[in-house]
């Protein structure tokens, strides 16, 4: 570590060391003020420091993870997936979808000024704007949903905060909070996977019993009969689970289920799809 004394001894002097630091602070403060945004406590937002790209006005709450803005844009919350409401046929809505929407409505109201922070990809395939959403009080809406069990963590793109979102989801699952109290959403044991799960996105729980390298994949084998395929080209991103200390550990894997060569399997593309249960 370079101390202020060392800087002074080197001839730079503390005056010159502090000057650029203070200037950078002032520039940062000025950029926030130019957006009219107040800084929220970092204690409130566990995952993402409060910062924003744009101020917007809320017009409508569509469901637990989608909002409509006054300017007509649809906002899809990055990194979470709440139960879907079928607006055309309400009876087909997913379990706990109305509760998730009601929770968002308890945090926001029409006309509220919100702050958005955009991810690396601006739009999803449906033309919705992808964003982290901060309430008027500076709270991250995604974090609130995950903590209370009104949404699950789900990564569709490069998401720098996925590990924090995964921890929040795991805590909610452990407490059977919100949607996690229902079998519809709870991770399924490998022994109960059946035809009804084919080609559906599921959470599957099992114990790592072996590893296997075959073809283009490294296979994580759960309970001796369920295979999780990790592309060898991207295996470096999965170092936490591709380790000997993962053997005999319980994991939860999420993804679309396939049945091939008489084996149930999930092919993963992002490390967020595999989580160690009760990590040390």
Language-model-detected regions and their locations in the chain:
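Small beta-barrel nucleic-acid-binding modules, primarily SNase/OB-fold domains
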Residues: 2-3, 17, 36-280
């Amino acid at each position: 570590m370079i101390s202020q004394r060392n800087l002074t001894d080197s001839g730079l002097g503390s005056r010159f060391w502090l000057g650029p630091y203070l200037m950078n602070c002032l520039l940062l403060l000025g950029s926030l003020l130019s957006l009219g945004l107040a800084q929220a406590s970092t204690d409130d937002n566990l995952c993402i420091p409060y910062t924003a790209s744009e101020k917007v006005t809320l017009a409508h709450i569509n469901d637990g993870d989608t909002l409509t803005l006054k300017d007509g844009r649809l906002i899809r919350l990055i990194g979470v997936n709440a139960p879907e409401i079928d607006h055309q046929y309400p009876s087909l809505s997913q379990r706990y979808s109305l509760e998730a929407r009601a929770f968002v409505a308890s945090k926001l109201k029409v006309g509220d000024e919100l702050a958005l922070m955009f991810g690396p990809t601006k739009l999803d395939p449906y033309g919705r704007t992808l964003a982290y959403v901060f309430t008027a009080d500076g709270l991250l809406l995604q974090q609130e949903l995950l903590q209370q069990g009104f949404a699950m963590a789900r990564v569709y793109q490069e998401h720098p905060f996925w590990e924090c979102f995964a921890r929040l989801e795991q805590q909610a699952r452990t407490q059977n909070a919100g949607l996690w109290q229902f079998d519809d959403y709870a991770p399924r044991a490998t022994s109960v996977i059946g035809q009804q799960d084919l080609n559906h996105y599921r959470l599957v729980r099992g114990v790592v019993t072996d590893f296997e390298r075959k073809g283009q994949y490294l296979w994580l084998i759960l309970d001796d009969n369920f295979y999780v395929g990790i592309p060898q080209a991207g295996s470096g991103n999965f170092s936490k689970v591709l380790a000997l200390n993962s053997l005999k550990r319980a994991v939860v894997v999420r993804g679309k289920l396939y049945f091939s060569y008489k084996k149930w399997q999930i092919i993963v593309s992002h490390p967020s799809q595999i989580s160690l249960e009760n990590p040390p």
